[in-house]
Regions:
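Sec-dependent bacterial lipoprotein signal peptides
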Residues: 1-20
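Lipid interaction determinants
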Residues: 20-184
Length: 184
């Protein structure tokens, strides 16, 4: 009986020591992971539009391969920006209403990428968060982009996407509404 107690005590001590070592190593890896803090506070879910998407539902396959299903209120035409096409990269903001998961903002990132132009600015949104300016004389060209909590951030300028279609883009911030057309 005494031998059994000693064995159990040794096993418990081994598990405690092993558990502490694992906790320290994973904490150090998290501190060195630049992606872990890059979008801290961002509630956006990123992924690809799945084949199960329909007029009132969105199937999103996130970057880890998990499948999410969202209901879409089609009475509000501003919920989905850029359309939903199977395989397109999407950014989704969600909320839970009466137990159902609703997509409150859907941005088609594939549609957003490309060359855009207005009278004042001409730029190209590229994959990987890069923006290339097409006008040499711009005083403050945009060089980076990201979606953060359903808003488009170009350098330090934050915009609401009022409308995104295949040929047009309307952005709004505190300075006003800016319209762009797609260049081919």
């Amino acid at each position: 009986m005494k031998h059994l107690r000693v064995c159990v005590a040794l096993m418990m001590a081994t598990f405690v020591i092993w558990g502490c070592k694992e906790g320290n190593s994973s904490q150090q890896a998290g501190e060195n992971d630049s992606l872990a803090t890059a979008n801290a506070g961002d509630s956006t879910i990123y992924g690809k539009c799945g084949e199960g998407s329909m007029m009132h539902t969105l199937e999103l396959i996130d970057d880890e391969g998990k499948v999410h299903h969202f209901m879409i209120n089609m009475d509000d035409s501003s919920v989905v920006q850029g359309g939903m096409l199977t395989g397109d990269r999407m950014a989704v903001i969600r909320s839970v209403v009466y137990g159902d998961t609703m997509a409150t903002t859907v941005i088609n990132l594939t549609t957003l990428q490309g060359k855009w132009s207005s009278l004042a600015k001409s730029f190209q949104i590229e994959e990987g968060g890069k923006v290339k300016s097409n006008a040499d004389a711009e005083s403050n060209p945009w060089t980076t982009w990201k979606i953060y909590n359903g808003k488009l951030v170009l350098n330090t300028d934050t915009f609401t996407i009022n409308e995104l279609r295949a040929d047009s883009l309307f952005l709004e911030n505190k300075e006003g509404i800016f319209g762009f057309q797609r260049l081919k």
